[in-house]
């Protein structure tokens, strides 16, 4: 992952300013991403926009290294507008904690610093009501060794309530929002079944910037 920061570009020994370099400058240490699954689906898979998904996305929503979080019962309750019980919220938090433990175990031998980024990588990480996402994201950033929260999502799945939550969490620990631009060319976007025009992506970036939220752009080279 390339992190473009022209302010520090000349100070870097590499040909580009890497994420590793950015993490060391920002947090003073190396950190590893732990791939997590919030249990969400995607509008490009559940029939809202399409059922086939983007052509580059894997069967697990490209969250291949994350343990699957099966909380459909609780997710359906929030989509019906029901209030989650304390037991529901506790179940969500415990599921995330279990994923964090498993994720840390996978990289602990090579991660001497013991610092991590909680990365909700699978499917669309904000494609759920705030009442469902809040206990999940809060549990992810609770451990001291978690330096930041990173959420992969679509630009058409960032309503004001979601942005309010992310902005609130950003006051506790840095929040990054990873958006799949993939291409700026309409014909290619249609071919890969991205499911939204470039204008939607641009508008989402503007709204995230206005909230002080860091944006990571996913692009396909070639």
Regions found by a protein language model. Name each.
Residues 8:
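Cationic, low-complexity basic patches in intrinsically disordered or flexible, solvent-exposed regions
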Residues 12-53, 58-116:
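N-terminal [4Fe-4S]-dependent radical SAM core
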Residues 78, 86-94, 122-135, 149-213, ...:
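Conserved non-cysteine loop/helix-boundary elements of the Radical SAM core domain that shape
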Residues 104-115, 121, 126-133, 139, ...:
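Long amphipathic N-terminal alpha/beta scaffold segment
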